Amino acid sequence: MKSFAAKVEEGVKGIDGKPSVGPVYRNLLSEKGFPPIDSEITTAWDIFSKSVEKFPDNNMLGWRRIVDEKVGPYMWKTYKEVYEEVLQIGSALRAAGAEPGSRVGIYGVNCPQWIIAMEACAAHTLICVPLYDTLGSGAVDYIVEHAEIDFVFVQDTKIKGLLEPDCKCAKRLKAIVSFTNVSDELSHKASEIGVKTYSWIDFLHMGREKPEDTNPPKAFNICTIMYTSGTSGDPKGVVLTHQAVATFVVGMDLYMDQFEDKMTHDDVYLSFLPLAHILDRMNEEYFFRKGASVGYYHGNLNVLRDDIQELKPTYLAGVPRVFERIHEGIQKALQELNPRRRFIFNALYKHKLAWLNRGYSHSKASPMADFIAFRKIRDKLGGRIRLLVSGGAPLSPEIEEFLRVTCCCFVVQGYGLTETLGGTALGFPDEMCMLGTVGIPAVYNEIRLEEVSEMGYDPLGENPAGEICIRGQCMFSGYYKNPELTEEVMKDGWFHTGDIGEILPNGVLKIIDRKKNLIKLSQGEYVALEHLENIFGQNSVVQDIWVYGDSFKSMLVAVVVPNPETVNRWAKDLGFTKPFEELCSFPELKEHIISELKSTAEKNKLRKFEYIKAVTVETKPFDVERDLVTATLKNRRNNLLKYYQVQIDEMYRKLASKKI
């Protein structure tokens, strides 16, 4: 059997109350030790400035201008043009009073100004603190105060919220710089509390008038404090040094250069995940290292397809929900084909899959099938796509397989956390044995599993499984102002992720469960709620699902947002002709959903206490606006409980009455 990872240490049986730990695994490129770091690339500033020297005239940052509610073509700034603006913005920050080590917030949607502000921070050893553009005033208050932010770059539509009375943090700011313009009214409002405001143009002008030499960072300096959006509690400030960022990018370069179809300065990345999220941030850093181009979506995910068609990216990265929607769209189109064409599509799918499973690359498995059927799907992704990367949560094997067959490009899953700079593990392109897995350790990190006895996971057992622990050079330095939490997750030099993994015989890592959000039901059984949501979410009737249980109850309940298309087909089969919202109130639909969830539970061999016993049917998907999900669409469990407390209580009341 081909092995994809190197075992560099054997496992150790637990004694004296200590848990057992499994073998330590590394990337094959690191089997004899971590490769030496490129001495020219030791900071985030090096990544950018070296590419400016090598690729001054390459397109770096692209955006679409909206005029009279019409979205125009992509416009571009070259590496040289971006560099000139970075120098001006950096000089303006210094003129406004920023000193090395000052914290600078960036609050808004992805755009060129976001990156220019970030690089200006790097140029002067300032600490960049991203804020999700979806944050409410409470979270913004917390981060600005906790990180002690002095200056903030803000999307123009966010400035008003910053200056509202319930957003108390504004008073500590020295300056607010708009991505575009600031109205006279808001400038006056800010001046009343002693805060200066600048338009982007004014700030550039100030930098030109008062130029300052750059003051680049050392490798050990803090590059950024990234606050995790968090599914519960206050956000955590994850401290990342310049060395960690640079090491990750160099490691990514080494990893990608192994493959025949390499990334180059001609590649184009579509950025639509929040830049405040580690996955997008590090993808962009990697693209800047290559001298490649990054184009930003125009701010509306509902019409992302339009940006894809206009930009024609070669690389897309997203969370599973993004790829699930792509899959749903393709499936919908297939349903509309006549039976003959659908039969041909399915036959070509099986034919290409068979050759992929024999080890052929996606481009050589079946050029005929690609030409007849699948190139049309590739065209829907712009026609030039070469790599799809899914991260943030597990992508179902069925969807990953479907994308590998039909998108005519490499499709891989990755795994990581903000604390590990996102890319802790990454799959191999064209290796079908990696379906449903997250691949192998990154070049500069090590992975091992640790026993979780209460869940029955043993890293030294027949099927080695346990909590995923990470050690290496691409790691955070700790949680900002929170040494207790840092000590809690860092034990003996290993970061404990809270995720449960399994090491397959070929050395590949598979995510199988979640230690975090682990609850104990009243009968003493442990349940991993997020794991169940991932499983039940694979059913076509489910668009969104939140599973709830607690230690005072013996059964699980859920709030389900059904898939409108699936519901409408179900209704048509039964002769119902009501609108979707009305169908969701039908008791027949509720029973149908419970039946479907039971079928999914049986298919996945779940334990009986993991079955969903009651559901509340919701018509509206969980959204960021109501603070029910994070910016990457992960359920905010505490907020969901507050929002649906009445429905939860009612479901348990009815379940109790049935038992009497």
Curated annotation (Swiss-Prot):
Annotated knockout phenotype: In stem, fewer and flatter wax crystals and disorganized cuticle proper and thinner cuticular layer. Reduced amount of wax in all chemical classes on the stem and leaf, except in the very long-chain fatty acid (VLCFA) class with acids longer than 24 carbons (C(24)).
Gene Ontology molecular-function annotations: ATP binding; long-chain fatty acid-CoA ligase activity; very long-chain fatty acid-CoA ligase activity
Gene behind the chain: LACS1
UniProt keyword Nucleotide-binding, yes or no: yes
Residue segments, region Fatty acid-binding: 492-516
Main subcellular location: endoplasmic reticulum
Protein name: Long chain acyl-CoA synthetase 1
A GO biological process held by the record: fatty acid metabolic process
Compartments reported by the entry: Endoplasmic reticulum
SUPFAM superfamilies: Acetyl-CoA synthetase-like
Binding site residues for ATP: I225, M226, Y227, T228, S229, G230, T231, S232, G233, D234, P235, K236
Tissue specificity statement from the Swiss-Prot or TrEMBL entry: Epidermal-specific expression along the entire stem. In cauline leaves, was expressed over the entire leaf surface, most strongly in trichomes and guard cells, but not in mesophyll cells. In flowers, the expression was detected in the stigma and filaments of the stamens, and in the carpel was expressed specifically in ovaries. In roots, was expressed in primary and lateral roots, but not in the root tips.
Superkingdom of the organism of origin: Eukaryota
PANTHER family linked: LONG CHAIN ACYL-COA SYNTHETASE 1, LONG-CHAIN-FATTY-ACID--COA LIGASE
EC number: 6.2.1.3
Keyword Repeat: no
InterPro entries noted in UniProt: AMP-binding_CS, AMP-dep_synth/lig_dom, ANL_N_sf, LC-FACS_euk
Keywords in alphabetical order: ATP-binding, Endoplasmic reticulum, Fatty acid metabolism, Ligase, Lipid metabolism, Magnesium, Nucleotide-binding
Cellular component GO terms held in the UniProt record: endoplasmic reticulum
Catalytic activity, as annotated: a long-chain fatty acid + ATP + CoA = a long-chain fatty acyl-CoA + AMP + diphosphate
Gene3D superfamilies the UniProt entry points to: N-terminal domain of ligase-like
Pathway, per record: Lipid metabolism; fatty acid metabolism
Enzyme class, UniProt record, top EC level: ligase
Requisite cofactors: Mg(2+)
Family that this chain belongs to: Belongs to the ATP-dependent AMP-binding enzyme family.
